[in-house]
Amino acid sequence: MRRILSVLLENESGALSRVIGLFSQRGYNIESLTVAPTDDPTLSRMTIQTVGDEKVLEQIEKQLHKLVDVLRVSELGQGAHVEREIMLVKIQASGYGREEVKRNTEIFRGQIIDVTPTLYTVQLAGTSDKLDAFLASLRDVAKIVEVARSGVVGLSRGDKIMR
């Protein structure tokens, strides 16, 4: 089962390692992890995407609440939410492949942010599925040389606020 946890925690040294320690102690892999300060520089928001057994994930979520640095934990998948990921991808193409890269970048609403005679660097934001679909659309027409992805970030929709 895929889970996305949003964790509001104090922006302090060691807070990240304590949260991540809960996952590593149980042998759970983190699919993606993003952490950054919020509009309040004393707080950070951590978004963790993981896949696993529901019982163990519930246990981890309960133990996250007990950590001193953690102020709030919310599972984004439990309600209406918005999630996004940013990807930078370096693509090698020539001839027809270059036209296909430009066309697919436009279709997926990405931006070409760097161009050389043999490479394009494309920036794309969206759901993980959208980014995966973009990569799949290029596999037959160009060579994907390098990929960097930010990991998922998300917020609840509507009036629900994490403070």
Curated annotation (Swiss-Prot):
A single cellular component GO annotation: cytosol
Record note on quaternary structure: Dimer of large and small chains.
Alphabetized NCBIfam families for the sequence: acolac_sm, PRK11895.1
Catalytic activity: 2 pyruvate + H(+) = (2S)-2-acetolactate + CO2
Regulation: Sensitive to valine inhibition.
Protein name: Acetolactate synthase isozyme 3 small subunit
Gene3D superfamilies, per the entry: 3.30.70.260, ACT-like. Chain A, domain 2
GO molecular function: acetolactate synthase activity; acetolactate synthase regulator activity
